[in-house]
Swiss-Prot record:
SUPFAM superfamilies: PLP-dependent transferases. It comes from Chromohalobacter salexigens (strain ATCC BAA-138 / DSM 3043 / CIP 106854 / NCIMB 13768 / 1H11). Keywords: Cytoplasm, Isomerase, Porphyrin biosynthesis, Pyridoxal phosphate. InterPro entries: 4pyrrol_synth_GluAld_NH2Trfase, Aminotrans_3, Aminotrans_3_PPA_site, PyrdxlP-dep_Trfase, PyrdxlP-dep_Trfase_major, PyrdxlP-dep_Trfase_small. This is Glutamate-1-semialdehyde 2,1-aminomutase. The modification N6-(pyridoxal phosphate)lysine is found at K265. Belongs to the class-III pyridoxal-phosphate-dependent aminotransferase family. HemL subfamily. It is found in: Cytoplasm. GO terms for cellular component: cytoplasm. The keyword Methyltransferase does not apply. It catalyses: (S)-4-amino-5-oxopentanoate = 5-aminolevulinate. Its cofactor is pyridoxal 5'-phosphate. It comes from the Bacteria.
């Protein structure tokens, strides 16, 4: 038994499923999860001392790689001053200014402790602002695990075959209308029937929790137009895409302006954090200015603010995101070429610094139904083979991959060399 397997067995005695987030359990992969000891740059090092080229990056935050010296230095510089105060600080104001500067759709922003808190708070704000109850979301889009949004969700809920969860009251779920992603006609039909009851639409502008599914042309623009006509709030969940698809997020990349934006991951530089922001008109309805309540004991934590500011300042340098997208293109084009040579049905999809690998004969994957129709068993064998060759991909066919600026051309070439060997074993899949 490996050390990781022993540690997993031990963890299962006191942690449900042995993990603190379900996708980490490697469920369906027929092996224990990798227990990581440390990480540096583009690499993970497990408890056995094995090194892996990492394309998970702590599920997205580590866009400059693990243990970035500038980010760690910023945290160290604050550490001796205290961990948390429960008071306003200058550093949280600097973070707010920086976010508003980078994302022009955000006039005001409030920090929270997770992406789930960000989306939950944005939904409450949209409902309070409009005086309506219903929220539209999309199949396979994951917006955290709050009750209102854990309906036909992606991410771990999709991997585990739980498109909704026991414990979510029907009285809450009935206010969530779930539609097919990338289907504007379905959205129009929904609003034709229920438009005066719909507080808002929440959407992943690039769906990253059913692998990586970019929006079809005009999908996001169409959502904006529908919300404008019906007086509903358009919420972009940019927890994953914010500062990664482009510096200004997917909204900058696709040229569509939401009313509210949810952020997380990169904004904390690897520390637990989230944020939501938007127009002054809507955000000023939050307590203590307005009647809509939201709070958090550790929100705006100074260490998280220091880490996030250091990272944002680093990635806003000219050319950073272009170089990241070039790395992704090299990897994805190389994977497709090697799959063709091996006779394996494989396509990739990408958006900025994120990408997806689909084992399918389809030319494109646009929605939940098409994502779940891909060959999950072939993915499982590919994942395990790549792991044996020292490449760490997301342990689920429904999670996006993430590139960092720490990945070198040699890392990408080593990944493609490993893929060539593994794909050769899948030829008759």
């Amino acid at each position: 038994m490996t050390t990781s397997a022993q540690l997993f067995e031990q963890a299962c005695r006191h942690i449900p499923g042995g993990v603190n987030s379900p996708v980490r359990a490697f469920k369906g992969m027929e092996r224990a999860p990798v227990f990581v000891e440390r990480a540096q740059g583009a690499y993970l090092y497990d408890v056995e001392g094995q090194r892996y080229i990492d394309y998970v990056g702590s599920w997205g935050p580590l866009i400059t790689g693990h243990a970035d010296p500038d980010v760690l230095g910023a945290v160290r510089s604050r550490l001796d001053d205290g961990l948390s105060f429960g008071t306003p600080t200058a550093i949280e104001t600097r973070m707010a200014e920086l976010i508003c500067e980078i994302m022009p759709s955000i006039d005001m922003v409030r920090m929270v402790n997770s992406g789930t808190e960000a989306t939950m708070s944005a939904i409450r704000l949209a409902r309070g602002h409009t005086g309506r109850d219903k929220i539209v979301k999309f199949e396979g889009n994951y917006h955290g695990h709050s009750d209102s949004l854990l309906v036909k969700a992606g991410s771990g809920a999709l991997t585990h075959g739980e498109p909704s969860s026991p414990g979510v009251p029907a009285s809450l779920a009935e206010h969530t209308v779930t539609l097919p992603y990338n289907d504007l006609d379905a959205v129009r039909a929904c609003f034709a029937e229920l438009g005066d009851e719909i507080a808002g639409i929440i959407v992943e502008p690039v769906a990253g929790n059913m692998n990586c599914i970019p929006p079809q042309p005009d999908f996001l623009k169409g959502l904006r137009e529908i919300c404008d006509v019906h007086g509903s709030v358009l919420i972009f969940d940019e927890v994953m895409t914010g500062f990664r698809v482009a510096l200004g997020g997917a909204q900058a990349h696709f040229g569509v302006t939401p009313d509210l934006t949810c952020l997380g991951k990169i904004v904390g530089g690897g520390m637990p954090v989230g944020a939501f922001g938007g127009t002054r008109e809507i955000m000023e309805q939050l307590s203590p200015l307005g009647p809509i309540y939201q709070a958090g004991t550790l929100a705006g934590n100074p260490l998280a603010m220091a880490a996030g500011i250091a990272l944002l300042e680093k990635i806003r340098q000219p050319g950073f995101h272009d170089a990241l997208a070039e790395r992704v293109a090299t990897l994805c084009d190389g994977l497709e070429a090697r799959a063709r040579e091996a006779g394996v049905d494989l396509i990739t999809q990408r958006a900025g610094g994120m990408f997806g690998v689909f084992f399918t004969a389809q030319q494109r994957v646009d929605n939940f139904a098409q994502a779940t129709a891909c060959n999950a068993d072939t993915f499982r064998r590919f994942f395990l083979g790549m792991l044996e060759h020292g490449v760490y991909l997301a342990p689920s066919p429904f999670e996006a991959g993430f590139m960092s600026s720490a990945h070198t051309p040699d890392d990408i070439q080593a990944t493609l060399d490993a893929a060539e060997q593994v794909l050769a074993t899948l030829e008759n899949a």
